[in-house]
């Protein structure tokens, strides 16, 4: 590949141990090569981009100073782990990242000993690193010895309450723990010029306790008339290390802010911390997301498709239909135009959920609560109790983080919070950590909840309207990542009758009851089955709760077999259907019932179609399920 950058130093790095013999000057050169290598790699594969570019120098410095994997390096979220993977023996696999049978886009314990703790969701690193620190002190890791525990967490992730819960606990325990705050959005504070740089170097240049003692002792040595002024000056100096007061109150020593792209400063501070820290310490590093390529873009290259390095133009397949996310956003905007009580909540995902479009139109009615799903859910519940009509747009996988609030603050009080659950089902390149596999199960078991799933983008538009009109209890509607089916779209949604499904086509012998966007696969399966002389009845449930009991019982009593299909785990729609059939003694009549759900495994990253193939839920799998259920020989199987 002739466009690959020249990387003579990086070419000799097989593991972090190879960094130990490099001079500080060569470590800086290595960082430059590593950044060029990452830009080239992601231009070929796509992936999370900006975060990794922002921590190149930090990654090199950490692996140079510390002894990984003996020292446990825990990356929060781990969007920024690409440089780390390149330095830890996975460079030759980077072109497989986020692809089937390739490297994960996140840290993953089963992938490398240099990934001591997996991640993908936010704000977990300090808790995990503290766990490693306690295990170290109690002799829990006899295989790799007792090393340092280092958490690298971004300023965005610090908006998650779990991070502060961990810091509070760490400060109480007093264990030697290193937290690096990677501040790449200037949301806490930028460095404050030469004074800040001097204070950071001074703090790193002497033992921490000596530094603090000197600061306290110096005041008492002054003549009495000058002591009050000196105390004020000391407080001013303390405030110059912006953010330090908060972290010190939590029990952490504080260093910073420092320039996270200045290799000399990073190495100096990290070496001093390694040599002298005797309790929890936080290093505040200021970095630029997208450093070296995309730092001037509005999103700083958070995630990207394959792209042309010279022009930045992304290589994307042409769109055949609007995305489900965009349909949701446009539908909600249309409803909000007519109803001033409609408000929207997102947990740090305005672009991903489409609420950036809503915010442009209704800035005072859209609330980004940060990475705080627990707060976001209860905040929405409070607005509902106050007479507003909140839509909480949250990915299925992230709604898990606010489940107690869904139960305690929303469901028990029957508050009409409307949950727009994006990324339902299997999501592709982000793999199992972002799959929306469980929301049907964990919502449909709650009394009073209305749970819907859109079979296509037109149905989604109707479900937005339906949720708006449900004003006496909570509701949820789920939809997948990606583009819709290309169906004709109504200008506005029409409220659906609660708990009523729809017949798609009538046949005989077997009925297939769909819930969600597998409907297209069901219809393709029916076409194949028709060539075998089998014409299934197809119905779309629309609702997992309340069930359309009349429709389900009719299908069961007039067919030899009933098969449900859903993009969720066991315990969801199919389980509720089975319970209904059992309670109505339908199984006593000999009905053959099968439920097609996601298997009891975590499915690694691949294309959604490949992931559903692993799950056994594509059209050919539905065909095979129908034939085996009816006792008809399956003529061929996939290799």
From Swiss-Prot:
Root EC class: transferase
Query: Cross-referenced Gene3D superfamilies, in alphabetical order?
Result: 3.40.50.920, 3.40.50.970
E.C. code: 2.2.1.7
Q: List the disulfide bonds.
A: none
Q: Which residues bind thiamine diphosphate?
A: 79, 120-122, 156-157, 184, 293, 373
What keywords are annotated for this sequence in UniProt? Isoprene biosynthesis, Magnesium, Metal-binding, Thiamine biosynthesis, Thiamine pyrophosphate, Transferase
The Swiss-Prot or TrEMBL record lists the needed cofactor(s) as: Mg(2+); thiamine diphosphate
Q: Which reaction does it catalyse?
A: D-glyceraldehyde 3-phosphate + pyruvate + H(+) = 1-deoxy-D-xylulose 5-phosphate + CO2
Transferase among keywords:
yes
Its Gene Ontology biological processes?
1-deoxy-D-xylulose 5-phosphate biosynthetic process; terpenoid biosynthetic process; thiamine biosynthetic process
Q: Which GO terms describe its molecular function?
A: 1-deoxy-D-xylulose-5-phosphate synthase activity; magnesium ion binding; thiamine pyrophosphate binding
* Pathway involvement of the protein, from the record: Metabolic intermediate biosynthesis; 1-deoxy-D-xylulose 5-phosphate biosynthesis; 1-deoxy-D-xylulose 5-phosphate from D-glyceraldehyde 3-phosphate and pyruvate: step 1/1
- InterPro entries given for it? Dxylulose-5-P_synthase (IPR005477), THDP-binding (IPR029061), Transketo_C/PFOR_II (IPR009014), Transketolase-like_Pyr-bd (IPR005475), Transketolase_C (IPR033248)
Cofactor, how bound (note): Binds 1 Mg(2+) ion per subunit. Binds 1 thiamine pyrophosphate per subunit.
- Positions that bind Mg(2+): 155, 184
Give the matching Pfam families.
DXP_synthase_N, Transket_pyr, Transketolase_C
Family annotation (HAMAP family): DXP_synth (MF_00315)
Record note on quaternary structure: Homodimer.
Q: Which PANTHER family match?
A: 1-D-DEOXYXYLULOSE 5-PHOSPHATE SYNTHASE-RELATED, 1-DEOXY-D-XYLULOSE-5-PHOSPHATE SYNTHASE, CHLOROPLASTIC
What does this protein do, in the record's words? Catalyzes the acyloin condensation reaction between C atoms 2 and 3 of pyruvate and glyceraldehyde 3-phosphate to yield 1-deoxy-D-xylulose-5-phosphate (DXP).
Entry's family note: Belongs to the transketolase family. DXPS subfamily.
Q: What's the protein called, per UniProt?
A: 1-deoxy-D-xylulose-5-phosphate synthase 1
Source organism (scientific name): Jannaschia sp. (strain CCS1)
């Amino acid at each position: 590949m002739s466009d690959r950058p020249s990387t003579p130093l990086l070419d000799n790095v097989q593991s972090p141990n190879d960094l130990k013999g490099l001079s500080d000057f060569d470590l800086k050169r290595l960082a430059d090569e590593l950044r060029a290598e990452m830009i080239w790699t992601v231009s070929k594969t796509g992936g999370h981009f900006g975060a990794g570019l922002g921590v190149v120098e930090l990654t090199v410095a950490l692996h140079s100073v510390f002894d990984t994997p003996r020292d446990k390096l825990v990356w929060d979220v781990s969007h920024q782990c690409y440089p780390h993977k390149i330095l830890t023996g996975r460079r030759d696999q980077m072109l497989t990242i986020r692809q089937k049978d390739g490297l994960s886009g996140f840290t993953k314990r089963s992938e490398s000993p240099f990934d001591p703790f997996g991640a993908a969701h936010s704000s977990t690193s300090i808790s995990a690193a503290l766990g490693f620190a306690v295990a170290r002190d109690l002799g829990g890791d006899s295989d790799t010895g007792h090393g340092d525990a280092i958490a690298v967490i971004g300023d965005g992730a610090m908006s998650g309450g779990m991070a502060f819960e961990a810091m509070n606990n760490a400060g109480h325990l007093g264990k030697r723990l290193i937290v690096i705050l990677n501040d790449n959005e200037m949301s806490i504070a930028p460095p404050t010029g030469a004074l800040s740089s001097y204070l950071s170097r001074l703090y790193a240049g002497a033992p921490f306790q000596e530094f603090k003692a000197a600061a306290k002792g110096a005041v008492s040595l002054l003549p009495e008339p000058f002591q009050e002024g000196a105390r004020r000056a000391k407080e001013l100096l303390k405030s110059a290390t912006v953010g330090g007061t908060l972290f010190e109150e939590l029990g952490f020593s504080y260093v910073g802010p420092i320039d996270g792209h200045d290799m000399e400063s990073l190495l100096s501070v990290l070496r001093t911390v390694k040599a002298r820290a005797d309790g929890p310490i936080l290093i505040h590093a200021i970095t630029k997301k997208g450093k070296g390529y995309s730092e001037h873009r509005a999103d700083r290259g958070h995630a990207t498709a394959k792209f042309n390095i010279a022009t930045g133009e992304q290589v994307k397949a042409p769109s055949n239909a609007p995305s489900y996310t965009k349909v949701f956003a446009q539908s909600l905007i249309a409803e909000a135009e007519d109803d001033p009580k409609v408000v929207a909540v997102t947990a740090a995902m305005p672009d991903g959920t489409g609420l950036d479009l809503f915010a442009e139109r209704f800035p005072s009615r859209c609330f980004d609560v940060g990475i705080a799903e627990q707060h976001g859910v209860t905040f929405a519940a409070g607005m509902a109790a106050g007479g507003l009509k909140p839509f909480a747009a949250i990915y299925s996988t992230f709604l898990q983080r606010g489940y107690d609030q869904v139960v305690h603050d929303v469901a028990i009080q029957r508050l009409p919070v409307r949950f727009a659950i994006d990324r339902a089902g299997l999501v592709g390149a982000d793999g199992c950590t972002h799959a929306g596999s469980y929301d049907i199960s964990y919502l449909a078991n709650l009394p009073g909840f209305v749970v819907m799933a859109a079979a296509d983008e037109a149905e989604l538009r109707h479900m937005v309207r339906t949720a708006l009109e449900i004003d006496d209890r909570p509701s949820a509607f789920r939809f997948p990542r990606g583009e819709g089916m290309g169906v004709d779209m109504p200008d506005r949604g029409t409220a659906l009758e609660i708990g009523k499904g729809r017949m798609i086509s009538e046949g005989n012998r077997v009925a297939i009851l769909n819930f969600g966007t597998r409907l297209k696969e069901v219809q393709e399966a029916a076409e194949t089955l028709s060539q075998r002389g089998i014409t299934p009845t197809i119905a779309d449930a629309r609702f997992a709760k309340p069930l359309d009991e009349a429709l389900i019982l009719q299908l069961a009593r007039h067919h030899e077999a009933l098969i449900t299909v859903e993009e969720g785990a066991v315990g969801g729609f199919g389980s509720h259907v089975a319970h209904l059939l059992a309670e109505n003694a339908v199984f006593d009549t000999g009905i053959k019932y099968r439920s097609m759900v996601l298997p009891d495994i975590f499915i690694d990253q691949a294309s959604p179609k490949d992931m559903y193939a692993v799950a056994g839920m594509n059209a050919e799998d539905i065909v095979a399920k129908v034939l085996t259920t009816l006792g008809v020989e399956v003529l061929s199987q996939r290799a």
